[in-house]
Swiss-Prot record:
Its EC number is 3.6.1.15. Gene3D superfamilies: P-loop containing nucleotide triphosphate hydrolases. It catalyses: a ribonucleoside 5'-triphosphate + H2O = a ribonucleoside 5'-diphosphate + phosphate + H(+). It holds the Pfam family Helicase_C. Belongs to the helicase family. NPH I subfamily. Residues 379-542 form the Helicase C-terminal domain. It comes from Choristoneura biennis entomopoxvirus. This is Nucleoside triphosphatase I. One of its GO terms (cellular component) is virion component. InterPro entries: Helicase_ATP-bd (IPR014001), Helicase_C-like (IPR001650), NPHI_C (IPR013676), P-loop_NTPase (IPR027417), SNF2_N (IPR000330). Residues 468-534 are annotated as: Binding to the cap-specific mRNA (nucleoside-2'-O-)-methyltransferase. Keywords: ATP-binding, DNA-binding, Hydrolase, Nucleotide-binding, Transcription, Virion. The lineage of its organism: Viruses, Varidnaviria, Bamfordvirae, Nucleocytoviricota, Pokkesviricetes. Transmembrane segments: none annotated. One of its GO terms (biological process) is DNA-templated transcription.
Amino acid sequence: MFALDSIVGKHINYALDKTQHLPNKINNSITNTEITLQDYQYFASRIFIGLKNLNSMLLFWDTGTGKTLTAVYIIKYIKELFPRWIILIFIKKSLYIDPWLNTISSYISDTSNIKFIYYDSTSSLDKKFNNIYRSIESSLNKKNRLLIIIDEVHKLISRSVKKDNNERNFTPIYRKLIKLANYENNKILCMSATPITNNIAEFNNLIGLLRPNVMNIKEEYINNGKLINFKEVRETLLGICSYKRLIEADSLTDTNYIDGYAKKSIFYHNIIMSDEQSKLYNMAERYDYKTELGGLKTMRRLISSFAFYDLKIKGDLDNVEYNEMIKRKLAEFSEFTKNINFSKAFINAFKNNEIKSKTDLLITDINNYNILYQYSCKYIEACRIILNSRGKVLLFEPLVNFEGISSLKYYFNCFNISYIEYSSKTIKMRDNDLNEYNNYENNDGNKIKVCIFSYAGSEGISFKCINDIIILDMPWNESELKQIIGRSIRLNSHEYLPINYRYVNVHFIISYSNNRKSVDKEMLDIIKNKQGKINVVFDLLKASSIETIHNMHKYIEPVDNEIIFEIIRKTRMKEMNISNVIINLKLYPITYCKDYDRATILKGFLNKDTNIIYDNDTPVAKLIVDNNNLPIFVIENDILIYITNDYY
């Protein structure tokens, strides 16, 4: 391993020698100021520019660490490697103006060779990219080279992974990208704080883009949190990424204040729905299980957020009828809340959870509160968290319409909570609102307390001086969760607050029906189960990074000429015969059932170390445990039956 490491280390030092004349500053022509690159930005840029045969690199850096500025620096100075480049940048459409166009315009005078493609826009992909592809394909010769930059590459990669063994619509474009990126002396730069979001298939597609045909990892290669053929895979990937993660803990782990990043503390709020909301939740559960989209848990997630009285589960209603019903219900709820304005005495009692113990509260306040709680235990808890926050609050609610942001805002009005909304419905005003929210005079939230944001604000947007963030609805993976939380914890995002206020409390509101069912808990478990294997891949990328190699061979003599990356790119890792790898697991026979189907009794074998249940060597379920980490079970007909979730 170390022989190949040292050769790559020699090439890294070769690149550093070759690019030592490059400045570590970049001039902003609009403000006439100079920005000094961070050491890691300068280092990665010089390696990528200095090595002709290192045609691909992943910037695996935390949110807020300057990936965009680094890419712009590379665009500006890559002419040191070759004078004429076509720059093709893949981004989300919402990030075109800020940060991309604003940053490029500030630092690069001639942008005529730069073209943008929106990978979340069908028209941009199908028409614009295909036209560009044809023109680039015909013009790639000794006069031009191509640099492809992909921002938030995980978003693009996830569109190329097969679903149910069927090709995704994006797959043909993915193949064209591979062809362009690996044509002679072209280069590709990918960027993401979370390059893998769901599974190992995404990792294989990412590597297929950066170094096609060199390897294929299978999920069974990962056992007990370790990659069985780690050495072979790492050697195949040496130098494939630059790694900068100041905080390596995942989104569900507390972190301390470090190097300009606010302290993070996790809080789980387990709350019980009203009887009315529980009733609708059970109806939604039956509806979800009957529909093709039941796996998305759609209706349960909607009802967990808000359940207005007499609200009908969609059932046989078509989309027009259902939407009309939703509009009527929202109008009714709006009319009901117009006259609710809680007294200061009630709000103080509510903040301190003293409503039941206070005897002098207005009966109208109590009645109105009970009705609001009946519709949404989540929104009530969110209001309590906000009122107890010392500063500004972010609230993530991906549901933009009736069951989400639209109804949530009425709750805020009742409790006199000031807010702005950053979502797909506020495109015209949201940037101005965000500027007011981030304004220095609002650092403590005295003017605007809350910013409600949906997926429209979960990437590429920065919020300043946030003290609390509330997650009302769980995303599907830790990557999205990291992006959401990353909006509030960025480099120096809290620098204008006193040191003791440089923290972010992350609140997860987990609602349970009165029979203890929770789609929020299901989603949280999915996130945790996915992340285990993804963390193995992240450790692999760290071990393969240019920083890890350089730290081991910092003072080694550089090579005279490039050779190694041309060889690595053309060497395929041998397939591993997993049947030859003997893994000893101690398993115990067990009787169990799934939590959502307690009528079906199953038999399997339990690994007590991991709580995973196997059937013919395949993991099929995982024990549900209580707060003391003890398994939950029932006894029927003198048989001990363990309660489990699906193994994801």
